[in-house]
Structure formats: C-alpha cells, structure tokens
C-alpha cells in the first residue's frame, strides 16, 4: 500500500515540495533559528586562528584637536554605534610582560589617570573600568597593555581605576569593587561601570564595553579556562557591566566575602532579587584569556561562602554600598590608570580550615568541588526595596 501511495504523482510532488521548502529554510538561516530555539545563539562567526595585532588601527584614529594636522575644534557628531576601527579577534600574549614605560609609549593618546576621549566625535558611552588588585603587578601590566588599545578602537570615553587593597589580610574582591565604584563616581557621572578581574584579557573588540540599560551584563561568557563556554547559567564572574543606577538598585556587591569564592553567585542572586535580568553577548564575541597563576597567599578558599550564600535573600539590603566602610589611603593619577589604595579592614571571623580536600583557588578541581557542594538557592520571597548608597561625604 505504501508503495502504491508513493507512486502517486500528487504524493511525490508533496514530498519534493517539502524537501525544497526545508532546503530553502536552512539556506536562509534556519540553522541559526534552530540554535536560538534549542540553545544559546552563538552569534556571528569569527576566525580566532588568525587574530589581529592588539594595536591594529590605532594610527587611523583621528588626531585630537590642537594636534598637528587636526581640524579646528567644533561641535562634534556622535560617534557611530559601532566603531569603524574594530578588527575582531586580537592576539593575546603573556610573554614578554611589557614595562609600564613601554605601555605608555604605545598609548600616547591616553591621558593622566588612564583617561581617554575619542577625537572627531562625541562618545556614546563614558565607561569606568574598575580593577580590584593586590600583588598582581605582571597581570596588571598585561591587562593595561591589551585593554587600552582595545578600548580606544571602540571610540569610548573611558577611565581605568585600579583598586589596591592595603595590608596583608585576606583579599576581598567584592568590597574592593564597591570602593572603586564609590571613588570613580566622585570623579565623574559615568554611564557605565565595568568590573574587571586583573587576570582576564579580552580577545575580540566587538565585545563592546558599554552597558545595557535593560539590566546588568555579564561579559566574560567564554573563557579559555572553561573551554570557551559558560560554566553554569548563573555564573556572573570575571567581567561584568552595570549602570550606576543598576548597581545601586542591587545595593552594590557584598562586603562579607573574604577570600576566594561565593561572591559571584551572591551578586547574581542580588540581580534577581532586585527585579533585574542578566544579559550576555554572544559566545563567539565574549572571548577572554586568563593569565595563568598559582593560588595567592591571602586569597585562600572562603570557608564561609556557602553559609553566606544561603543568607543572601535576607542580607542583600543590609550588606553592600549602604554598609561600606573603608579608609582611603592614597589616590594617585598615573599615566595609565588611577590608583586607589584603601584600607578595607580584615575578616572579622578569622581563618577557619574548610572540610574536604584543598585545591588552589580558581583551579578546575576547586571549581568542580564547589559545584558538587553547591546548595540549591532559597526560594525567593517578596521583593524587598534596595537601600541606596550612603551620602557621598562618608566612607
């Protein structure tokens, strides 16, 4: 019976027509539609096997007003939404580590304090890059060497702030970021705050360092450490971007996470509790390379992180920008960045040995162990109202 059915002209015509329709659908981008339906849209395709030099196209940038050959100053149009100087994938090298003098020489347009403003057009975003730091001088120089030309090609107005934790106490990344946000906003009304780990180098300048007015952005979505994929859906670590209003709406970042681990998940929970959603660039765009390093003394695994995480729902309105205390020790305008040195105190709980095997913080073994120990998030209750930051005059 099936054979007789297939021999009918109308049946054959229907089958041939169906095949043609499927072929046309796929040729017109059906694979991308299916990808968006069943998984994360990978975005545009880039060839990372043939990257450009990270300093490509800088010589093509317009000269600043007053410079030799520059047109006279006048009212400027807005810079294009996507800069014509972008090149896509860029080479990232960890050796040799450049000196600060070499980085200054290669970035003559960068002004005191690590500030830059494009010539020839009005920037569409003023972005502050905030980098928590301690005892990572080689990493900092690599970041500055790669990040300055990367940002200049995007035609942004930007400033780089390095927030240095004074003393030898346990490292507190999230609290340093709170300090950096407060100090950066004393300088200027920035449109966008980029919170940037010192050991992550961007590999594609189409990954724009601008904020999304609809909600916080997690930008480091494809790190070589995790095989260029997102390790888990709630991950918010590495590099993230928020407007000042978004940052204050979630009461900033927590101050109580001393040592490695936990604060990224707390921050992702804050975003949800504040009624916002996380957005991300396509996986093909948000590529980062991590500078290899051993576990840092003073940044051991935080044995209290899981206890803190289960309290986030109730603690986020009390622990953050509205409870931030620190002592500003120095504010220095260097040729490549603004250095903020702050005394943020010490862990009031003191050290405690965690149970189970110890692995270097940030290692793949430590990551797997943490995922196995991860507790399910508490069910959200009624959305509380975030308190805003303390008055500007107080620390």
Swiss-Prot record:
Cytoplasmic side: 1-10
Protein name, as recorded: Beta-1,4-galactosyltransferase 3
MF terms in GO: beta-N-acetylglucosaminylglycopeptide beta-1,4-galactosyltransferase activity; metal ion binding; N-acetyllactosamine synthase activity
CDD domains: b4GalT
UniProt-annotated binding residues for Mn(2+): 199, 293
Species whose genome carries this gene: Mus musculus
Residue numbers binding UDP-alpha-D-galactose: 132-136, 171-173, 198-199, 228, 260, 293-295
Transmembrane segments: 11-31
Chief localization: Golgi
GO annotation, biological process: carbohydrate metabolic process; galactosylceramide biosynthetic process; protein glycosylation
Reactions it catalyzes: an N-acetyl-beta-D-glucosaminyl derivative + UDP-alpha-D-galactose = a beta-D-galactosyl-(1->4)-N-acetyl-beta-D-glucosaminyl derivative + UDP + H(+); N-acetyl-D-glucosamine + UDP-alpha-D-galactose = beta-D-galactosyl-(1->4)-N-acetyl-D-glucosamine + UDP + H(+); a beta-D-GlcNAc-(1->3)-beta-D-Gal-(1->4)-beta-D-Glc-(1<->1)-Cer(d18:1(4E)) + UDP-alpha-D-galactose = a neolactoside nLc4Cer(d18:1(4E)) + UDP + H(+); a beta-D-glucosylceramide + UDP-alpha-D-galactose = a beta-D-galactosyl-(1->4)-beta-D-glucosyl-(1<->1)-ceramide + UDP + H(+)
Chain spans, region Disordered: 340-395
